[in-house]
Amino acid sequence: EAFDYAFKDGSFTQAALIIKDGKLIYERYRGITDNEADILASTSSSNSDQSFYKDLLNQRDKDSLISSWSTAKSFTSFLIGIAIESGHINSINDYASNYIQEWSRDDRSSVTVKDLLDMRSGLVPICFNVSSGELGNCLNSSDSASGGNIVYANDQLTKCINRELATEGLKYPWYENGANEYINGSFVYSNCDTMVLGEIIFRATGQDIQTYADYNLFSKLNIEAFWWRDYELYGQSNGNYLAYCCLDSTASDFAKFGYMLLLGGISDG
């Protein structure tokens, strides 16, 4: 009954599993429905062809890759922990400017790795402007809270690094829709904060986040996962990996990661 509810038309659910005592005891999969494809086509700003979504998401099974979207942030945070354990990063209290040298000579030098992990960096959030096709400051709280749709921009990392610190006491449209003055240390959901964490891993370890995860995490869990990249030709690896989202893997492999977290970071094989 619970699975019937989870898979009802309009839920967009395509996979669900139950893990008990480390064992997979139930799983169900389905492709996208006609109604769901219609919804995607009618709300998308990039593709309004219903058949595109039906062809892309029509059949789902245990081997189908599923995109994590923002669940990838948990993987990035875990990799920061691995980098600390391996000595590449000293601690979460390190100044981010130790690795992002662009911040070392201005007020952004006070931002710590922990601030980025907690999304309390104080850096102005940026959003994708559909009309201009460019990234810029978010114009309202709703766009900011959704992550700004920066995934549509060709080069996301540069803009994420080049953000300025917000000024306490000023009103910003992205902070409570400009109704109240900004307070330092406030939580502001930000894809860019996590995108910068991916670059910190790259600069601290000398490996992009995909390569670092393949060896230090994915292989240990016996899973395969594939990170999306932006279109910056001279980035980390012919494109900068989107540390804040878009990690593709199977539902069962995602479950292995989740179960490992449930066990406090211990792999159950």
Where do the protein language model's features map onto the residues?
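Catalytic loop of the DD-peptidase/beta-lactamase superfamily, centered on the K-T-G motif
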Residues: 1-20, 219, 240, 262-269
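Glycine-rich, acidic and aromatic/proline-enriched surface loops and short helix-turn segments
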Residues: 21-33, 45-46, 118-123, 163, ...
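Acidic/His-rich structured neighborhood in mature extracellular/periplasmic domains
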Residues: 182, 190-194
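A short, well-structured edge-of-sheet supersecondary motif
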Residues: 6-57
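Active-site helix/loop module of the DD-peptidase/beta-lactamase fold
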Residues: 56-57, 62, 67, 85-128, ...
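Short, charged, amphipathic alpha-helices and their helix-cap/turn boundaries
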Residues: 38-56, 97-98, 132-182, 207-226
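Beta-propeller domains
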Residues: 192, 198-199, 203-204, 210
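Active-site SXXK
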Residues: 22, 49, 55, 65-92, ...
